């Protein structure tokens, strides 16, 4: 599934990339929605 709202992959130093939530119990990972376990 593609993210309904695409992830912002902006790395600042050693911070993790910013992630925007997908709908319905899914999460954004590598610009794809994966099941949030």
From Swiss-Prot:
Disulfide bond sites: 3-17, 7-28, 22-33
Coiled coil regions, renumbered to chain: none
Main location: secreted
GO molecular function, one term: toxin activity
InterPro entries according to UniProt: Hwtx-2-like
GO cellular component assignments: extracellular region; host cell postsynaptic membrane
Tissue: Expressed by the venom gland.
Subcellular location: Secreted
Taxonomic superkingdom: Eukaryota
Record's keyword terms, sorted: Disulfide bond, Neurotoxin, Postsynaptic neurotoxin, Secreted, Toxin
Residues spanning the membrane: none
Known role: Postsynaptic neurotoxin.
Record text about domains: The presence of a 'disulfide through disulfide knot' structurally defines this protein as a knottin.
Similarity field: Belongs to the neurotoxin 12 (Hwtx-2) family. 02 (Hwtx-2) subfamily.
Name under which the protein is recorded: U4-theraphotoxin-Hhn1v
């Amino acid at each position: 599934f593609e993210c309904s709202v695409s992830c912002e992959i902006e790395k600042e130093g050693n911070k993790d990339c910013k992630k925007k939530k997908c709908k319905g119990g899914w999460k954004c990972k590598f610009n794809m929605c994966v099941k949030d376990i």
